[in-house]
Amino acid sequence: MDALEKGAVTSGPAPRGRPSRGRPPKLQRSRGAGRGLEKPPHLAALVLARGGSKGIPLKNIKRLAGVPLIGWVLRAALDAGVFQSVWVSTDHDEIENVAKQFGAQVHRRSSETSKDSSTSLDAIVEFLNYHNEVDIVGNIQATSPCLHPTDLQKVAEMIREEGYDSVFSVVRRHQFRWSEIQKGVREVTEPLNLNPAKRPRRQDWDGELYENGSFYFAKRHLIEMGYLQGGKMAYYEMRAEHSVDIDVDIDWPIAEQRVLRFGYFGKEKLKEIKLLVCNIDGCLTNGHIYVSGDQKEIISYDVKDAIGISLLKKSGIEVRLISERACSKQTLSALKLDCKTEVSVSDKLATVDEWRKEMGLCWKEVAYLGNEVSDEECLKRVGLSAVPADACSGAQKAVGYICKCSGGRGAIREFAEHIFLLIEKVNNSCQK
């Protein structure tokens, strides 16, 4: 992270004694429009994602819970519906491609603002220099994957309706702070925010507010003065479970578990999965075919995947297998998975559609695990899709979840666990 992303949010102290800029923003005329037509100030979401991350190489597009890291915040920003434009500022081709796949526009960051010494403010000012239409910038941190559209909607309202010049995100923490011991300077520690003789209980103390770095919104005039926090300021308090930041490797597994339980998965309301269709070759198996001396076909699969299938079935999810290859009856029988299977399939989408109708399901209740070009249409159509880690690039682009495991090496079990977590989210949302 650069200086701002680590919390140094200005190049100097915020202006003091400056008159409050609390007046609602003036409406601006649409450029190129006829007289009398007005529009609100242009609010742009801007995600800074350079390719030279030192903590975790290319972390901005590393898969978190099967989704490129940057994808989580882009999904939230686009679905919030409050931005006139959503941008990613980057100097890297791969990050640019991922950003466009999620529907964001791309600003190619210059080498001058892509250095290790460059600050977020440098990159934001550069962006504004190229985009005169932008009046307000919502700088959203790529490393905050639990961000929800509702957070952004409320902040946009604070800026547009309540007249704030800048709003930044905070989280409430109940942590006692102590001074640092420095040899030759301070030999003992002292409490900074408590009286040890009267230690408060958590429920008796409001705690303190800390910046969590999730986002910084500021008006153009403030940014051009060199600040992201100033003028009429306000904080936006995020829920603790949504306050996640990824900086080093140790943060990754913690963030992954948090995002699976508290992350934003899109506008579509999650439905409980009732049917999982899995491609045999390259998903259930590793795609290798062995031929014995007597010309018999031999394939193998991971016991973990068999257990995953069993767990799915016990939870009430039908599991069916599909293949475009002509697998022999002996081979299918030897699998001993007790799943309905269709082989020699030339049109997988038609077959899955037939199964769906047979079970009286909508597409949102169907999950699909595939790995080949022939699986792409199914992957795009179903409610929940995934591919093994070694799937072809076309299939990877068509899905929302990419397994860490390869085909025939635990991908089904991993996807099953993912399905169970999503079912838990559905049940929790219903209870609420």
UniProtKB/Swiss-Prot annotation:
Q: Could you give the subunit structure recorded for this chain?
A: Homotetramer; the active enzyme is formed by a dimer of dimers.
Q: Which gene encodes it?
A: Cmas
Its job? Catalyzes the activation of N-acetylneuraminic acid (NeuNAc) to cytidine 5'-monophosphate N-acetylneuraminic acid (CMP-NeuNAc), a substrate required for the addition of sialic acid. Has some activity toward NeuNAc, N-glycolylneuraminic acid (Neu5Gc) or 2-keto-3-deoxy-D-glycero-D-galacto-nononic acid (KDN).
Q: What is known of its domains?
A: The BC2 (basic cluster 2) motif is necessary and sufficient for the nuclear localization and contains the catalytic active site. The localization in the nucleus is however not required for the enzyme activity.
State a single Pfam family of this protein: CTP_transf_3
Chief place of localization = nucleus
What family does this chain come from, according to its entry?
A: Belongs to the CMP-NeuNAc synthase family.
Q: Where does it localize? A: Nucleus
User: Which pathway does it take part in?
Assistant: Amino-sugar metabolism; N-acetylneuraminate metabolism
Q: In the UniProt record, which is one GO cellular component term?
A: nucleoplasm
What GO molecular-function term can you cite, just one? N-acylneuraminate cytidylyltransferase activity
What stretch of residues is annotated with the motif BC3 motif? 267-274
Q: Which organism is it from?
A: Mus musculus
Active site residues of this protein: 199
Give positions of region: Disordered. 1-38
Q: For the modification Omega-N-methylarginine, which residues carry it?
A: 35, 50
Q: What is its EC number?
A: 2.7.7.43
Protein name, entry field: N-acylneuraminate cytidylyltransferase
